[in-house]
A protein has these predicted regions:
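N-terminal secretory signal peptides that target proteins for export/translocation
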Residues: 1-17
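Bacterial N-terminal signal peptides
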Residues: 17-30
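C-terminal PAP-associated
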Residues: 36-491
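Short, solvent-exposed loop/turn segments enriched in Ser/Thr/Gly
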Residues: 60, 508, 517-524, 595-597
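Low-complexity, acidic Ser/Thr/Pro/Gly-rich terminal tails and inter-domain linkers that flank the onset
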Residues: 487-518
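Asparagine-centered strand-capping/turn motif at beta-strand->loop junctions
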Residues: 526-533, 545
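Intrinsically disordered, low-complexity Pro/Gly/Ser/Thr-rich segments with frequent PxxP/GP/PP motifs
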Residues: 555-606
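Terminal connector regions
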Residues: 596-628
């Protein structure tokens, strides 16, 4: 790059000068060769299983990072977890950057059921959780999500709420905003089929302890109107994107949605009239219903938004959505540099995708360096579109160009397992009857929900938070993704030496499965660094014993399993498992971090006796003393 610059610079000078400059340039480049910084690149970390609460469907995810501690992450999801199999919202909390998680249940959710989870953090680190249950309930936590306040019920009849906090230094810093889709007072949609919907806003100036509202933002004209993810610009201006959708009951031929927005410059007191962003073709309600029952996973979802909070493209607003094109979904992006007054022509993010493939369910975020991250569900490689991978790309130039997409998921999602298809009831009293409406995770949310989450922490790391179907049932996964740019030179790796890591690494198991007919035990095994040292791959696990020494000395009868999938083909002691790819793109395993899960397949000695013992040695590399 520097050499090309010199060639262009010297084009107008004399031959003698060109020779001197050429000699200087070669000397300079030779001297600087060791200091070159890499081109922008995406670095994907291991896939981390977040949910460990059973073979039950998880749908509609959200995630936020604490602005005062980027390792404190808060996620939310609908989970088919109630005692009768119905849905409730749960929170998931991490204090180590997403390596380990703890789940949180809320009493109202477990009693009444719920949906549409929202999460966020206040400007001083207070955690917020919102869910629709017996009302729109707001919860606070002043310890990062460990303990929570009692519910503050803000409304009784709402839908599709959205949450944002002003993290700027503007006049409304710290203000919490919460929108809700609700009926216009006095409307009788069930009787007249005339849709009268509006978006309202609640605001809090005391860290979520109390709210003012609802205040009407906008209303539809016999259409639905739902707020999308809210944004706050650098001066505190509130940007409220909304999706205007047809009244499907009387307009079954309508085939486009309209994305619009309103602004508030006075902290959520008054709002501008809605202005147009784009029209989004979705094919019509008949096409949507047909797609939902087709066995395909690609489905339509609303547009998503992000803003550069203060990087090199300050206040640039980004919008991404899927266009329906010849029965395939194509992910496009548009941006505005003038607070929504004008928008760039939408352009595809992955123009080289095969004609058969769909890109759907996107989410976007911008980190403090101004890097725009985008991830989505991708059916490339699967013409039947009944499974998907997770893809990610990024732009370092304000959405003008994008890096080659990276695969995030370490396994393919094929989400048609029994946990996704098992229906759960919604029980209510209606028209003098006790009714039970049944829905399964897959039938209601074949694409894992109406939306998915991603956040970017103050450390610049992106954290996608997705519903993953590798087990057949939608479970929650995340990964830490870094976008290395020219301003972030790679740190040279220290000189390393091979070592046993068995005193530095432990085994962490994802949920274990067992098939009685085949007697196969499936063990998803991760390595966790429990030392204070950085450890380096490649890592290898070697099975050293399948009988505990005490049992051997005591002549106890033991059940010894057979190993079915060792890397070296051995079926007993001496079998090895290769973890060289378990870090994904990472070059080291930091303290408290975990690898991706590698599946160990064992065959139990008996169909009904599945107790056994394993002793293993783990090897890898450590930095030579004095080399770090």
């Amino acid at each position: 790059m520097f050499g090309q610059y010199l060639l262009a610079w010297r084009s107008g000078v004399s031959a003698t000068s060109r020779l001197l400059v050429g000699v200087f340039a070669m000397a300079f480049v030779a001297a600087a060769a060791g200091a070159e910084t890499p081109s922008p690149r995406i670095v994907v970390g291991p896939n981390i299983l977040v949910s460990r609460d059973g073979d039950i469907a998880h749908c509609e995810t959200m995630i936020a990072a604490n602005p005062t501690d980027p390792k404190n992450l808060l996620g939310g999801s609908i989970v088919m977890v109630r005692p009768d199999g119905g849905s409730a919202n749960k929170a998931y909390v991490s204090f180590d950057g997403g390596s380990t998680w703890t789940d949180v249940s809320f009493p109202e959710e477990m009693e009444h059921g719920g949906g549409d989870p929202q999460v966020g953090f206040g400007i001083t680190g207070t955690a917020y959780f919102v869910g629709l249950s017996n009302g729109m309930n707001f919860y606070r936590s002043e310890d990062g999500g460990k303990t929570w306040s009692k519910a503050l019920c803000l409304s009784r009849n709402g839908d599709h709420e959205m949450l944002v906090t002003d993290h700027t230094f503007g006049p409304f810093a710290g203000r919490v905003y919460l929108t809700d889709e609700t009926d216009v007072p006095g409307s009788k949609e069930l009787e007249t089929l005339q849709m009268q919907r509006r978006v309202v806003l609640f605001r809090s100036s005391d860290d979520g302890r109390s709210f003012i509202g609802p205040v009407e933002v906008a209303r539809g004209n016999n259409t639905g109107l739902a707020a999308q993810n809210l944004l706050v610009l650098s001066d505190g201006t509130l940007f409220i994107p909304m999706l205007e959708y047809p009244n499907y009951a009387i307009n079954k031929e309508a085939s486009t949605w309209k994305a619009v927005f309103s602004l508030s410059t006075d902290g959520g007191v008054t709002f501008s009239s809605p202005r147009r962003i784009a029209e989004i073709p979705f094919g019509g309600v008949k096409a949507m219903r047909k797609s939902q029952g087709s066995g395909r996973v690609d489905q339509m979802a609303g547009p998503v938004f992000a803003v550069d909070p203060g990087g090199k493209f300050r206040d640039r607003i980004y919008a991404a959505w899927t266009d329906l094109e010849n029965d395939r979904y194509r992910l496009v992006l548009s941006w505005s540099g003038d607070r929504g007054a004008t928008w760039s022509t939408p352009k595809p993010l992955d123009p080289g995708v095969p004609a058969y493939a769909s890109q759907f369910q996107p989410m976007i975020a911008v980190n403090p360096d101004g890097v725009l991250g985008v991830y989505w569900y991708d059916t490339e490689g699967f013409p039947s579109r009944d499974r998907f991978e997770i893809s990610f790309t990024a732009s370092v130039d304000g959405g003008e160009t994008f890096l080659a997409k990276a695969r995030v998921s370490s396994a393919t999602s094929n989400p048609f397992g029994s946990g996704n298809l098992r229906p759960g009831p919604f029980v209510s009293q209606d028209r003098g009857l006790v009714t039970a409406s049944f829905v399964s995770g897959m039938s209601r949310w074949p694409n894992g929900g109406d939306y998915i989450g991603m956040t970017a922490g103050t450390d610049g790391i992106f954290h996608p938070f997705w519903t993953d179907g590798r087990s057949g049932t939608y479970q929650l996964y995340t990964s830490a993704i870094r976008v290395r740019t020219d301003s972030q030179p790679a740190t040279p790796a220290p000189e390393k030496t091979a070592a046993s890591l068995s005193d530095k690494v432990t085994l962490v198991f994802d949920p274990i499965q067992y098939d009685r007919e085949t007697q196969e035990v499936l063990l998803p095994v991760r390595l966790k660094n429990v030392s204070k040292e950085t450890l380096y791959p490649p890592f290898k696990v070697e099975i050293k014993e399948l009988v505990h020494p005490y049992s051997a000395k005591a002549h106890e009868e033991v059940d010894v399993p057979t190993i079915l999938n060792a890397t070296n083909g051995k079926t007993g002691v001496g079998a090895t498992f290769d973890y060289s790819k378990a870090l994904h793109d990472l070059e080291s395993l930091e303290p408290e971090a975990v690898t991706d899960a590698i599946l160990w397949r064992f065959k139990a000695a008996s169909a009904v006796k599945t107790s056994f013992h394993v002793g293993a040695d783990i090897t890898g590399f450590v930095a030579k003393k004095g080399a770090e």
